[in-house]
C-alpha cells in the first residue's frame, strides 16, 4: 500500500465518471498519457473489463490508503463546496418537479450521463428549499421510491418522489458535498457545508442514518442572518420583552427559555447574548451543536466522543473568568447543579429546559433533584414560547368556531374566525410564516416564597397568570384576530381529540371565557 502523491491530491481531475467512481470506490488519472487507477484493494475481473472498455488502453492499479482515496474523491467531485454559490437553479422560472421528471436511472455507470443532472437536481432541491424558507430537507429511501420532503413552518411536506435507482447516486453526491466518507454506509455520520444565495448565507448541517433501503439524509438549513436578529425583533410581547431585558441586565442568576423542539429557543438566547455582547464582558457558551457563530463570544461544542458534555464544558468555562455563560440545554442533574452554583456565585447563566410551559421549568428542576430553596434563590426569569403558523392572507376563509373548541379555549359560541384553504402563494398549505406566542414567569418575591415553600405547579400557575397572558390565552387572541386557525391551535398546543369529549380541561392553562 502506498501514499497518493501530493501533486495528484492537489491538482488531478478524474478521467472516470462520478457514478462509477462512487460505486467502486476507485479514482483514475491520466498523467502524461499513462493511466493510473487508485483503489484500496485489488480490482475484480469485471471492474477490470469495464475500465478497459471505457479507457480503451492498458492501465496500472495502485493500492492506496482508504482515507487518502476518500479525500481525493471528495476534493474532485465536491460541486457545492464551502461558500459556493447556486446559480441557474435559483432563477424564479426554474421548475424543480419538471426537471426531476426528466432524470432517469441508467444501468451503465460508465456512460457518465448522470453526473450533470444529479448535480443540477441537488442544486435545485437546495435552492428551492431556501426560497420556500424550509428549515430541513429529508432524503428518505424506500423500496419503490426516494422521497424528498421539506419542513416548512414546522410541518413536513413531500416535494419529490424519485426512481429508487437514483438513491445511491443522490446520497453519495450529498455525502461528497458534505465531505463525509462515501464508503461508510453502516454508521451514522455528521457534516457541515456553507451555501451562498445572493445576499443570504446558509449553513447546512448534514446527518446520515443507515436504513433498510439505503442511507437517510437530513439537511438542517441554518440561515446565518437569524443569528443577527435584534432582541427587539423577536416578536415577544412588550411586557415579556421588558422582563427579559431587565433580567439580562442582572449580574447573576439564571434565565431559562423553554418550549418544544423548533420553537425558537436558541434564537431567543442568541438575541439576548448579542444584546449583552461588548468588550467589557466575557461571554462563553457550550452548545450541542453550535448553530451560528456569534462575534465576540467564545463558543464551544459538546463532543461526546471526547467526554466534553454540557456539565464538563460548564465546569471548565467557570475557570475562564466569565461574566455570562450560556448552556445549550440543562438535561441532567449534574448540569443543573453546576448552573445553579454558577448563578449563585456572580455569574449570569442562560439556558433552555425542555418543558411546554414556563412554570413547568420549576417542576423540571425539582425533578432533577435541585432543592427548592436553591431554585428560588437563583431563578430570575422563565420564558416559554412556541411558534404558531400564520394563515395565508391570500386564501384564508371565514368560518364559525366549533362549539367544543370554543369551550376549550374559553371563547364565545358562534364566534367568526378564519380557516386555512391553500393557494399557490402558500404552496397549497393555507399557511405562510409563523408567529411566536409566549408566556413569562418573572420570579418576584411572592413566587420566590412559593417555590421555597414547595407550592405545586398549579398553584404557581394560578398566581402567575391571574393577571398575565398565558400561551393559550395568547393563542386565543391570534384566533380572534384571524391570524391563525383552530386546527393550528389544536396542533401547536398538542391537544388530543379526546379533549373535546372530556369534562375536565385542567391540563391546559386556559383563559377565562370572553364575550367577544
Show which residues each predicted segment covers.
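Short glycine/Trp-rich loop-beta-loop segment that forms part of the substrate-binding cleft
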Residues: 36-82, 234-248
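Charged, low-hydrophobicity low-complexity segments
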Residues: 4-5, 10-13, 66-124, 132
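Polyanionic, low-complexity intrinsically disordered segments
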Residues: 1-54, 190-198, 202-209
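Short, flexible helix-loop junctions that flank or precede catalytic/ligand sites
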Residues: 111-128, 132-504, 508
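Core recognition of P-loop NTPase motor domains used across DNA-transaction enzymes
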Residues: 19-30, 46, 50, 71-102, ...
Amino acid at each position: 500500500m502506498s501514499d497518493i502523491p501530493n501533486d495528484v491530491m492537489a491538482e488531478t481531475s478524474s478521467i472516470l465518471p462520478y457514478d462509477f467512481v462512487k460505486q467502486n470506490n476507485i479514482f483514475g488519472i491520466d498523467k502524461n498519457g499513462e493511466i493510473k487507477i487508485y483503489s484500496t484493494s485489488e480490482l475484480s475481473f469485471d471492474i477490470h473489463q469495464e475500465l478497459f472498455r471505457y479507457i480503451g488502453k492498458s492501465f496500472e492499479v495502485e493500492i492506496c490508503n482508504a482515507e487518502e482515496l476518500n479525500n481525493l474523491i471528495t476534493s474532485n467531485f465536491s460541486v457545492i463546496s464551502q461558500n459556493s454559490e447556486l446559480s441557474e437553479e435559483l432563477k424564479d422560472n426554474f421548475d424543480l418537479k419538471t426537471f426531476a421528471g426528466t432524470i432517469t436511472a441508467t444501468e451503465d455507470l460508465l456512460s457518465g450521463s448522470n453526473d450533470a443532472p444529479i448535480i443540477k437536481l441537488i442544486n435545485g432541491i437546495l435552492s428551492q428549499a431556501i426560497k420556500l424558507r424550509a428549515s430541513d430537507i429529508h432524503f428518505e429511501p424506500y423500496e419503490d421510491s426516494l422521497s424528498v420532503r421539506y419542513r416548512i413552518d414546522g410541518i413536513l411536506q413531500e416535494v419529490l418522489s424519485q426512481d429508487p435507482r437514483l438513491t445511491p447516486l443522490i446520497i453519495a453526491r450529498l455525502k461528497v458535498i458534505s465531505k463525509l466518507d462515501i464508503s461508510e454506509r453502516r454508521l451514522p455520520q455528521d457534516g457541515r457545508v456553507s451555501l451562498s444565495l445572493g445576499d443570504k448565507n446558509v449553513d447546512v448541517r448534514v446527518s446520515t442514518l443507515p436504513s433498510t433501503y439505503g442511507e437517510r439524509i437530513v439537511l438542517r438549513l441554518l440561515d446565518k442572518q437569524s443569528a443577527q436578529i435584534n432582541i427587539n425583533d423577536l416578536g415577544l410581547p412588550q411586557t415579556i420583552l421588558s422582563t427579559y431585558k431587565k433580567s439580562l441586565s442582572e449580574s447573576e442568576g439564571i434565565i431559562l427559555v423553554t418550549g418544544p423542539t423548533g420553537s425558537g429557543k436558541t434564537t431567543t438566547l442568541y438575541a439576548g447574548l448579542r444584546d449583552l455582547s461588548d468588550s467589557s464582558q466575557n461571554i462563553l457558551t457550550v452548545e450541542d451543536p453550535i448553530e451560528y457563530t456569534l462575534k465576540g463570544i467564545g463558543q464551544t461544542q459538546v463532543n461526546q466522543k471526547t467526554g466534553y458534555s454540557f456539565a464538563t464544558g460548564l465546569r471548565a468555562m467557570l475557570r475562564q473568568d466569565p461574566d455570562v455563560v450560556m448552556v445549550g440545554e440543562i438535561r441532567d442533574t449534574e448540569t443543573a447543579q453546576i448552573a445553579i452554583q454558577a448563578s449563585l456565585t456572580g455569574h449570569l447563566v442562560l439556558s433552555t429546559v425542555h418543558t411546554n410551559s414556563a412554570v413547568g421549568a420549576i417542576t423540571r428542576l425539582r425533578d432533577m433533584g435541585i432543592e427548592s430553596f436553591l431554585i428560588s434563590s437563583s431563578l430570575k426569569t422563565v420564558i416559554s414560547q412556541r411558534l404558531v403558523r400564520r394563515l395565508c392572507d391570500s386564501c384564508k376563509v371565514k368560518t364559525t368556531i366549533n362549539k367544543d373548541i370554543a369551550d376549550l379555549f374559553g371563547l364565545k359560541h358562534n364566534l367568526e374566525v378564519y380557516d386555512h384553504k391553500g393557494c399557490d402563494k402558500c404552496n397549497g398549505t393555507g399557511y405562510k410564516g409563523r408567529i411566536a406566542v409566549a408566556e413569562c414567569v418573572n420570579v418576584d418575591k411572592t413566587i420566590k416564597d412559593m417555590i421555597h415553600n414547595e407550592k405545586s405547579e398549579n398553584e404557581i400557575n394560578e398566581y402567575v397568570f391571574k393577571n398575565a397572558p398565558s400561551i393559550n390565552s395568547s393563542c386565543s387572541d391570534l384566533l380572534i384576530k384571524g391570524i391563525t386557525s383552530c386546527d393550528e391551535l389544536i396542533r401547536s398546543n398538542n391537544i388530543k381529540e379526546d379533549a373535546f369529549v372530556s369534562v375536565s380541561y385542567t391540563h391546559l392553562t386556559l383563559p377565562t371565557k370572553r364575550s367577544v
